[in-house]
UniProtKB/Swiss-Prot annotation:
This is Small ribosomal subunit protein uS17. The keyword Ribonucleoprotein applies. One of its GO terms (molecular function) is structural constituent of ribosome. GO terms for cellular component: cytosolic small ribosomal subunit. Keywords: Ribonucleoprotein, Ribosomal protein, RNA-binding, rRNA-binding. Pfam families: Ribosomal_S17 (PF00366). Belongs to the universal ribosomal protein uS17 family. One of the primary rRNA binding proteins, it binds specifically to the 5'-end of 16S ribosomal RNA. The gene is rpsQ. The keyword tRNA processing does not apply. One of its GO terms (biological process) is translation. InterPro entries: NA-bd_OB-fold, Ribosomal_uS17, Ribosomal_uS17_bact/chlr, Ribosomal_uS17_CS. Part of the 30S ribosomal subunit.
Amino acid sequence: MALKERIGTVVSDKMDKTVVVAVINRYPHPTYKKIVSRTTRYKAHDPENTCALGDRVKIRETRPLSAHKRWAIQEILNKTSQTKEVKK
């Protein structure tokens, strides 16, 4: 069985070795045929903490890594040039 893959945007990188990726699914409504967008948020494993907020990434399904984490970062498609500000 093939592993599932999704493409989405990093919406949170505040956890250690974990990012939250928002994936937008578009499909036609069964009755009205209007294109409906639904956003699903996945927690994905990022072992080197390389992803930043706003990055476009490809995630793949993996074994359960924690209570809510079943996806891993496969590659970063578009890197944002944001830098993190350190609060003092």
